[in-house]
């Protein structure tokens, strides 16, 4: 999927009532109404890009692995870390067993960033420290776990399969690795007795991309994907093929994301709620991106100017239209079907979601796609209630909006 969603410009349409206290002559034949219905699309809207300090990526069911560098977005490297769980098995001492092979199986998640025509390469390194959650029971896109970079366990090459979630990739691992594990299991060695002993013997794997790669690829993480399977057979009258599966932990896994934006329109972007990067400093565009933590702040600095239209002004309806930059999306890089819109205070601290006028349904943006020229593709939000609430407010009481990818994309993809 496309690296970033860029918003070139937005339109907001207002319809409001204004009541003027105009004096009329006593005894006039007609009484003139002091109410006016006005429609305008000239309300100033300011966009800026914000960057989260880090994102929780532990235990997700999708991960990203790869490397990409270009002039617009900079350099992005995504790696994956996983602890493995030892299976429970018992062997009949009267039967002989022979090792066959050991493999790792991965399934694509279908999403990607970059050139999918180039062969990609991933290396697997043994961890030298155990993966541990923090006090809040999370691991993050910025977490660091040491691994032995001088002694890879294995490496493999593959061709990306964009959009194909069911595509299986099974890679044979070194027999020496498999035989060592198999013999420990046959011997009923202590390291295979429990997860506690096993994780001290084998702390896990770091999946590191080749730095010459041109694509970041998404993979599923579950009991079928990222599993290490040890194949063996029993020597009886009838040879019986068997297998043991070492699954990746459901909690002690995480995605690490590294980036370098030097020389790009976003090189001045710093993390933190108080470090918003104005569109005037980023080619007059605002940006969203999953996993690196970019999202958009939307402000209405001159909203209260509407109050000058009369003594009593009320907003009847207001619609916000957000236009993605042409050329940043298409058949190969589809736009998200939904976006999330939140309210925030003046310090960009998130407060709540934007709902419809009834307050019951959360708005996710009505996506209108121009299939012909792609000039008029936009997301539409009803901001009537939000602007009614904020009209006339100042200072700490004034709210902003935050536009963010939905959680399933923001925390697991580089869309």
Positions of predicted regions on the chain:
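Secreted, disulfide-rich extracellular signaling modules
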Residues: 2-7, 13-415
């Amino acid at each position: 999927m496309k690296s970033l969603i860029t918003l070139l410009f937005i339109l907001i349409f207002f319809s409001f009532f204004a009541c003027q206290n105009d004096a009329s002559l006593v005894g006039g034949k007609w009484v003139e109404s002091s109410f006016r219905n006005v429609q305008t699309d000239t309300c100033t809207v300011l966009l800026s890009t914000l960057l989260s300090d880090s994102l929780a990526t532990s235990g997700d069911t999708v991960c990203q692995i790869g490397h990409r560098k270009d002039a617009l977005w900079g350099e992005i490297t995504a790696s994956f870390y996983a602890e493995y769980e030892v299976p429970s098995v018992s062997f009949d001492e009267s039967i002989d067993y022979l090792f066959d092979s050991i493999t790792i199986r991965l399934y694509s998640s279908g999403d990607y960033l970059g050139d999918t025509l180039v062969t990609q390469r991933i290396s697997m390194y043994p961890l030298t420290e155990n993966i541990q959650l923090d006090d809040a029971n999370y691991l993050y896109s910025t977490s660091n776990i040491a691994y032995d970079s001088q002694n890879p366990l294995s490496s493999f090459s593959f061709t990306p399969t964009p959009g194909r979630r069911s595509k299986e990739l099974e890679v044979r691992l070194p027999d020496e690795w498999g035989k060592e594990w198999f013999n420990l299991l046959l011997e009923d060695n202590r390291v295979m007795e429990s997860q506690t002993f096993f994780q001290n013997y084998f702390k896990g794997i770091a999946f590191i991309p080749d730095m010459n790669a041109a694509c970041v690829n998404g993979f599923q993480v579950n009991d079928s994907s990222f599993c290490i399977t040890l194949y063996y057979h029993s020597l009886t009258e009838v040879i019986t093929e068997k297998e043991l599966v070492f699954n990746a932990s459901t909690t002690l896994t995480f995605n690490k994301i590294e980036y370098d934006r030097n020389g790009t329109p976003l090189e001045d972007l710093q993390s933190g709620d108080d470090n918003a990067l104005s569109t005037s400093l980023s080619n007059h565009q605002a940006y969203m991106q999953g996993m690196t933590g970019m999202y958009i702040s939307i402000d209405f600095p001159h909203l209260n100017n509407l109050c000058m239209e009369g003594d009593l002004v009320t907003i009847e309806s207001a619609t916000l239209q957000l236009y993605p930059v042409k050329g940043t999306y298409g058949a190969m890089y589809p736009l998200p079907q939904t976006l999330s819109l939140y309210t925030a205070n003046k310090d960009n601290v998130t407060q709540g979601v934007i709902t419809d006028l009834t307050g019951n349904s959360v708005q996710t943006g009505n996506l209108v796609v121009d299939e012909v020229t792609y000039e008029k593709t936009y997301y539409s939000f009803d901001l009537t209630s939000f602007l009614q609430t904020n009209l006339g407010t100042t200072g700490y009481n004034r709210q902003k909006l935050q536009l963010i990818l939905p959680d399933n994309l923001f925390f697991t993809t580089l869309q």
